[in-house]
Amino acid sequence: MVLPASMRLRGHRCFDHLHRRGKRYYGTWMVLRKAPSNAKLLRRDIHGLLTQTQPHSCRIAVVISGKVHKRAVVRNRLRRLLHDHLRLRFEARSTHSDVWLLISLRPGADADEANLLEECDRLLEEAGLQP
């Protein structure tokens, strides 16, 4: 299942915020960036209303470069795998953090799904986001 729209992080200003202000946690196959949320940076529609309904919740983006794998099918499968894993982790939590997360995969991250998910959990725990 895909990540719900209320949990997705979109827009170049949000990504710039994460790159400038985010704390980085490094793993073998991925980098996790965590920053406090900033509702002013979220996308708005033509009427000035937020396009996403919950401005104060955990929002997540997964970025997978073409260097990870040359085939888009493989990159999309990895993105869906991480989206589903993160959705299950954050929906199970009773309290929602007011943070934004950006997960960037490094080249070679398509090696083993189990190791990838294990590393994701380890980085979330290191960032203080694992229950």
Swiss-Prot record:
Read off the SUPFAM superfamilies from this record.
Answer: Ribosomal protein S5 domain 2-like (SSF54211)
Query: Any idea which GO molecular function terms this record carries?
Result: 3'-tRNA processing endoribonuclease activity; ribonuclease P activity; tRNA binding
Q: Which reaction does it catalyse?
A: Endonucleolytic cleavage of RNA, removing 5'-extranucleotides from tRNA precursor
EC number(s) per entry: 3.1.26.5
Give me the Gene Ontology terms describing cellular component: ribonuclease P complex
Summary of the function given for this chain in its UniProt record: RNaseP catalyzes the removal of the 5'-leader sequence from pre-tRNA to produce the mature 5'-terminus. It can also cleave other RNA substrates such as 4.5S RNA. The protein component plays an auxiliary but essential role in vivo by binding to the 5'-leader sequence and broadening the substrate specificity of the ribozyme.
Name of this protein: Ribonuclease P protein component
Which species does this protein come from?
A: Synechococcus sp. (strain WH7803)
